[in-house]
A protein has these predicted regions:
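Cytochrome P450
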Residues: 1-409
Length: 409
């Protein structure tokens, strides 16, 4: 039987055939290239998201297993990543989530719809009407970056340097394979981002403003306010989680519609389907490809003995295509209901930024569908689309397309 090898370029393009094979023949699969277990069935992945024997603090055991030289390189990265909500367990997670929920609330997100639409309109106005363009570079990477930077009160002019630093950090967080200097690049990215954010925090100490950084600085519970490292870590999480994952969602959504023109037509003719369509994009080829956990106590899962200390990857992409949970799982159906995809997680680690990601996708895709008569890839799918080299994230890094016979409305 084939195993899952994240260095296999063909799996970057389309991992779903192999994942389906594993799901049907060995749903709890030992993966030698990753030295980890893979879970591929919907019920197993859903259970893994909340199972008490599976810890979300998977970075610390990995870090401690490294050689001294690599630990020294990554110490500056771990200083902040150890404070991320996604790697925390109660009671620390409970405290941080309680403080963050009112800062990034659904009401705040909905109030941002006009500004999100203005950013989308501005980006699409700059897209070439007679030449191919890279949707990821020209739209999908910029929209969530500008939205998040506006929320945090950061200057959009700083985008290029923030993106460069974030790309370095992504090599570590996204579990990129085959990048020899990824730890040093992650360290450099984290160091630069932390220094930049420390300066932003100091500016707001001198002159508070009405932005998310200021509101996080003012948030307080019975244990007091967030410490400076916690503030920097929270800003990093918002920047990274709110930017990288939404970029991937936008790119994958456009790729899915380009591959399914009948669904594009249906969405154009029935715009009220947009919320349902975004949920289907999240299910069909969502940005969360897997979540990693560490086993805290030995267990047996579907006949397989899993030892304490083992790593487990719950393959969200495989679960979202499980025929036990979804009819016609390999078909894109923007009318699908119900749609209980697992892309945003479950339980205490349900994605804090889910409402914002949904809003950005709805506004952007609606503007593209209603504003242009026809889309087309610039060449074959293999020629036009490059995919992330990552284990836990999925999405295009390049998507060359054309807007043909376009007319602005």
């Amino acid at each position: 039987m084939r195993t899952y090898d994240p260095t296999d370029v063909s799996l970057r393009r389309n991992p779903y055939g192999l994942l389906a094979e594993l799901r049907e023949t060995e749903p709890v699969h030992w993966c030698p290239p990753l030295d980890a277990w893979l879970l591929t069935r919907y019920d197993d992945v859903k259970q893994a998201m909340t199972a008490p024997q599976l810890s979300s603090d998977r970075l610390r055991p990995f870090y401690e297993s490294l050689k001294d030289e690599r630990r020294d390189i990554l110490s500056g990265v771990m200083r902040y990543l150890n404070e991320w909500l996604v790697f925390k367990a109660p009671p620390d997670h409970t405290r941080l989530r309680r403080m963050m929920n009112p800062v990034i609330s659904p009401r705040l997100v909905q109030s941002m719809r006009p500004s999100v639409r203005a950013i989308v309109d501005d980006l699409l106005a700059g897209v070439s009407r007679d030449q191919p363009f890279d949707f990821v570079h020209d739209v999908a990477a910029l929209l969530p970056a500008y939205v998040i930077m506006d929320m945090l009160g950061l200057a959009r002019a700083d985008f290029d340097k923030i993106k460069g630093w974030s790309d370095g950090l992504r090599l570590f967080i996204g579990t990129a394979r085959g990048v020899p200097d990824k730890y040093q690049r992650a360290r450099d990215g984290a160091d630069h981002l932390a220094a930049y954010l420390r300066e932003q925090i100091e500016q707001r100490r001198r002159a508070p403003t009405d932005d998310v950084i200021t509101r996080m600085m003012q948030a307080e519970d019975e244990q007091g306010k967030l410490g400076e490292d916690e503030l920097i870590a929270m800003c990093l999480l918002i920047l990274f989680g709110g930017h990288e994952t939404t970029t991937s969602l936008l790119g994958s959504s456009v790729a899915a519609l380009l591959a399914h023109p009948s669904q594009w037509t249906l969405l154009r003719d029935t715009p009220e389907l947009m919320p349902s369509a975004v949920e289907e994009f999240l299910r069909y080829d969502g940005p969360s490809h897997s979540i990693a956990r560490v086993v805290t106590e030995s267990m047996t899962w579907d006949g397989q003995h899993i030892k304490a200390g083992d790593r487990v990857f719950a393959m969200v992409g495989a679960a979202n295509r499980d025929p036990r949970a979804f009819d016609r799982p390999d078909e894109l159906d923007i009318t699908r209901s119900p749609n209980r995809h697992l892309t945003f997680g479950q339980g205490i680690h349900f994605c804090l930024g889910a409402p914002l990601a949904r809003l950005e996708a709805q506004v952007c895709i609606q503007a593209m569908v209603s504003g242009f008569d026809r889309w087309a890839l610039d060449g074959s799918e293999d020629q036009a689309i490059d995919w992330l080299d990552a284990m836990v994230m999925r999405g295009p890094t390049r998507l060359q397309m054309r807007l043909e016979n376009t007319s602005q409305t």
